[in-house]
Amino acid sequence: LFLLLMILQSCNNTDTNQLVSPGLKVDSKDSLKLNQVINFNLIEYPGVFLKSEGLEEWEDFKKLHESLKRLSDLNLRDVQVDLLSLSGRLKEVSKKTLPGTLEVPQIRSRLKVVEMQAQKSRYFTQYYREDSLILSLNKLYESYNALVSRMTTLDAENAAVSQKNIKENQ
């Protein structure tokens, strides 16, 4: 009997129950914004590399990098608009022939991966789950950083192969 009374008392204890107003809804986007600080690692704009390749006027790539930089601020209210803009810029870049020595399968495939990750992130803005959007955006930035890294290392690899070919031909 004592145990039964104790169980009933604990169920009626209003101090331990959470009181939530029936009209109050907590949006998962807002709770995410309030509870977490999210940092996306965006690689620096490869200005030196682009200048050495004679591509400092490559406007499509500048706009693409600016879109990713804007998205890294992660204003959850505008994330869908930012991703839509980013997807458009990625389509523009992928439709055109890449300049200089960048039109190779290694760069083209990484560009496609970035485009796919942007589409995936757009999907998660519509069918939002608190952790899935952030995870998807992290993968988007990893993919973009891999693209830029590959662009910069491709030049070094081409130079090394050229040096090897010159030595073999002598």
Annotate each language-model stretch with its function.
Residues 17-21, 88, 101:
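Contiguous segments within soluble domain cores/interaction surfaces
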Residues 31-47, 51, 122-170:
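C-terminal amphipathic alpha-helix
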Residues 92-108, 125-127:
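Short, solvent-exposed, charged loop/turn and helix-capping segments
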